[in-house]
């Protein structure tokens, strides 16, 4: 971290992207500034954002590969230049972009002689390859080569114990870290009692998301992390009664919900489609898969109903709360969407 004296202003706190470039398909760079900050605040924000960017951003990668008739990962396969271990390492480097949650299957099935690249991976519809030219293996003979793959979205660095699996599958140490590196520097500006700080933040990503998208997601994760402290504890409610209870994401929700209940204007809920609610594509797809097409369908579901939907997560509940709170001018019933 570097501190230097530079000229600056004392305007309202704001951020801006001052540089953005694509060095390669798997290397994006972005440089951002946040200013003006009081003395010490730049360090606080810089440290928190750096840790969130490196450890809290989710990524998608290949976590397991299954070969046929391979005794161990150090084996060689006739007609293939690389060993099984080298193929696993190449698969580990494949960069994927997706909004999937949970585990999905993929595969490779080709006939040699030819080079196998990431483009040869048969993926589920929700997953795409960032760099299709990434190498996997070189088939030197006319053989049929097939691999079954497992894909998962997670965060951080996941390792599994090495052991021989009877079905011929091998774990791949997953690196679910779309952000490759983060640097920040602090510059002081002003004179005397009017000194302020400017935070410069540099972000490098692997191409599965842009630095701006990574910064947004890291900021949202930090907000969600601190959000529980904004909720006042209800009087007369013990910790044991409250420990398993979900708290809506905005501390002003109860107040706004009261205002919504005062609105007696009748609205045909079956004519308001969830397409109009500005939901994220992931939340929207989850609801669509559960045959929830209108606001009436949504309000007819309980928390338990929604949580039984495949791939539906707590973040989706929060997002639905935010959206309804912002756009819903109707009288919500206590037993409707009670989460």
From Swiss-Prot:
It is an enzyme of class 2 (transferase). Pfam families: RNA_pol_A_bac, RNA_pol_A_CTD, RNA_pol_L. GO terms for molecular function: DNA binding; DNA-directed RNA polymerase activity; protein dimerization activity. It comes from the Eukaryota. Keywords: Chloroplast, DNA-directed RNA polymerase, Nucleotidyltransferase, Plastid, Transcription, Transferase. The keyword Lipid metabolism does not apply. Its EC number is 2.7.7.6. Residues 1-233 are annotated as: Alpha N-terminal domain (alpha-NTD). The N-terminal domain is essential for RNAP assembly and basal transcription, whereas the C-terminal domain is involved in interaction with transcriptional regulators and with upstream promoter elements. DNA-dependent RNA polymerase catalyzes the transcription of DNA into RNA using the four ribonucleoside triphosphates as substrates. This is DNA-directed RNA polymerase subunit alpha. The gene is rpoA.
């Amino acid at each position: 971290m570097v501190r230097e004296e530079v000229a600056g202003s004392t305007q309202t706190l704001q951020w801006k992207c001052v540089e953005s470039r694509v060095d390669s398909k798997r290397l994006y760079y972005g440089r951002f500034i946040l200013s003006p900050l009081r003395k010490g605040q730049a360090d606080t924000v810089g440290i928190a954002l750096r840790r969130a960017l490196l450890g809290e951003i989710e990524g998608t990668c290949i976590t397991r590969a299954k070969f046929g008739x391979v005794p161990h990962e150090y084996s060689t396969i006739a007609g293939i230049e690389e060993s099984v271990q080298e193929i696993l390492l190449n698969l580990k480097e494949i960069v994927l972009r997706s909004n999937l949650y949970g585990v999905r299957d993929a595969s490779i099935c080709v006939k040699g002689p030819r080079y196998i690249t990431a483009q040869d991976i048969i993926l589920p519809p929700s997953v795409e390859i960032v760099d299709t030219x990434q190498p996997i293996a070189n088939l030197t003979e006319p053989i049929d080569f097939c691999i079954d793959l497992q894909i998962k979205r997670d965060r951080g660095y996941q390792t599994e114990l090495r052991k021989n699996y009877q079905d011929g599958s091998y774990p791949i140490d997953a690196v679910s870290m779309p952000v490759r590196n983060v640097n920040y520097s602090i510059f002081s500006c002003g004179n005397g009692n009017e000194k302020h700080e400017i935070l410069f933040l540099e972000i490098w990503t692997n191409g599965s998301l842009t630095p701006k998208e990574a910064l947004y997601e890291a900021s949202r994760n930090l907000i969600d992390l601190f959000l529980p402290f904004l909720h006042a504890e209800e009087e007369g409610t013990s910790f044991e009664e409250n420990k398993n209870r979900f708290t809506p994401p905005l501390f002003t929700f109860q107040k706004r919900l009261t205002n919504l209940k005062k609105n007696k204007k009748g609205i045909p809920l079956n004519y308001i489609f969830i397409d109009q609610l500005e939901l994220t594509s992931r939340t929207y797809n989850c609801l669509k898969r559960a045959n929830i097409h209108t606001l009436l369908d949504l309000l007819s579901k309980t928390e338990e109903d929604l949580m039984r939907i495949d791939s539906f997560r707590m973040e989706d509940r929060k997002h639905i709360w935010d959206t309804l709170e912002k756009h819903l001018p109707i009288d919500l019933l206590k037993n409707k969407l009670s989460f």
